[in-house]
Structures are given as C-alpha cells and as structure tokens.
Regions:
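Glycine-rich loops and low-complexity Gly/Arg-rich segments
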Residues: 29-34, 60-64, 80-84, 108-112
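A generic structural signal for well-ordered alpha-helical segments
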Residues: 28, 76-77, 100
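Short alpha-beta junction capping motif
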Residues: 4-10, 50-95
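A structural signal for well-ordered alpha-helical segments within the folded catalytic domains
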Residues: 18-22, 67, 71, 117, ...
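An acidic, glycine-rich "communication" segment
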Residues: 89-130
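Enriched - but not universal
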Residues: 12-15, 63, 103, 111
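Aromatic-Pro/Gly-enriched surface loop or interdomain linker
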Residues: 1-53
Length: 130
C-alpha cells in the first residue's frame, strides 16, 4: 500500500507555487506516494482526512488562513502525519498566524543580504531503501 501525501499550493506567485508543487509531486510519486495536489486551503477543512495522510507539503506564501484549518493540520501533525516544505512556501505561509509558526517550527524573517543575492540551489534526491 502506497503512502498518501497532500501538496497544497497557492499564495504569492513569486515562489512559483504551482511549479514547485509539480516538482514535489514528481519526487513523491517516484518514492511511491499517492499524491493529491490542491490549490485551495479548503482541503484543511476535513480534519479526519488529514489524519489519515502520511505527509502534508504546504507551498503557500503570504496568505491568510482560517483558525480552524490551522487547528486541523496541527492535530494531524501531532498525531504523526509528516510535514515538509521549503523556504517561504511553508514558514512564510501565514505571517500573522502564530499557531502556524509553532507548528512549522519557524518563521520567515528576511533574506540574508537582502534580495538580489545570487546563489545556487542543488537538489539531491536520496532514495529510501525499499
């Protein structure tokens, strides 16, 4: 039986949420996950569905979220559902929601050196032993 993942994308276009969600989807499918992709926060409304997932990958930047949605996803994570994300797609999702920040374990503050710093990102995929 495959593991189940949910990728939720949206918000500010600068972090290319749809494209990044597609990259995450491909990576997870190659690891034998069944992946659902949603571009609405309303998927967080179903508390019980969230709790049967193995992984949630938010990629939503600078948005607003219902308090009940944060409670639902937090409960799922507390019950053992994995949470993974990158950069501003996870920790800059909802700047004004402290509960989201506690759940993710971080908050976006600033780009070191400000914007415009050139850098290279290397993505290295390590395959799980099957």
């Amino acid at each position: 039986m495959n593991k189940k993942a949910l990728i939720v994308w949206g918000g500010w276009d600068g972090h290319e949420p749809e494209q990044v969600a597609g990259i995450f989807k491909t990576i997870l499918e190659e690891e034998n996950f069944d992946v659902e992709v949603a571009n609405t926060l309303d998927v967080y409304a179903d508390r019980e569905k969230l709790k049967i997932l193995d992984l949630v990958v938010p990629h939503w930047t600078m948005g607003q979220i219902e308090g009940t949605y944060v409670s639902h996803i937090s409960e799922a994570v507390q019950s053992g559902v994995g949470l993974a994300g990158c950069h501003g797609g996870m920790c800059d999702s909802f700047r004004t929601n402290v509960d989201w920040q506690f759940m993710t374990g971080g908050n976006w503050v600033a780009h070191p050196g400000n914007d415009g710093v050139n850098y290279t990102v290397n993505i290295k995929i390590l395959r799980a032993n099957t």
